[in-house]
Amino acid sequence: MTVIRNTILIGRPIEEVFDFAVDTRNEVKWNPKVRAMTKLTDGPIGLGTRMVAKWTISGHIELECAEYERPYRWAWANGGPIAVTVTVTLSEEAGGTRLRAAFDARAHGPARLFFPVFVRIMRKDEARNMGYLKACLESGWAAQASPQP
């Protein structure tokens, strides 16, 4: 198990950060390695919502919302050869919203052989992605076209 932690202050209200970032379909707007994100379940985003994701370095991976506590906390999890749970916690601070992300990855079977390389890549990507997310939200672009239910 490896946990990668990142934190960033985003100059936007907590509800806006939560609503934009919890909806992983928005990740295509700020994460250059996301190719597609499709919602599989009906209704609004919440506990049990499922998505299918395609990143540049993976096949299609199914995600499930494992925690949902608006506007303070959520988690998305996937199984597979490298199981990942990303847990995000938000708190209000002077100047905006503090976002804390924990990327918890566990390798199974043959994936353990390349897991150290995966972790090195993800450490860099996750830190960089915090900056991309911040820029997207603070520019106001995020609010222009967020997908909802």
Question: Which positions does each model-derived feature cover?
Answer:
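Hydrophobic ligand-binding cavity/cleft-lining segments
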Residues: 1-42, 149
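Beta-strand/loop substructures that line and gate deep hydrophobic ligand-binding cavities in soluble
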Residues: 77-128, 132-135, 144-146
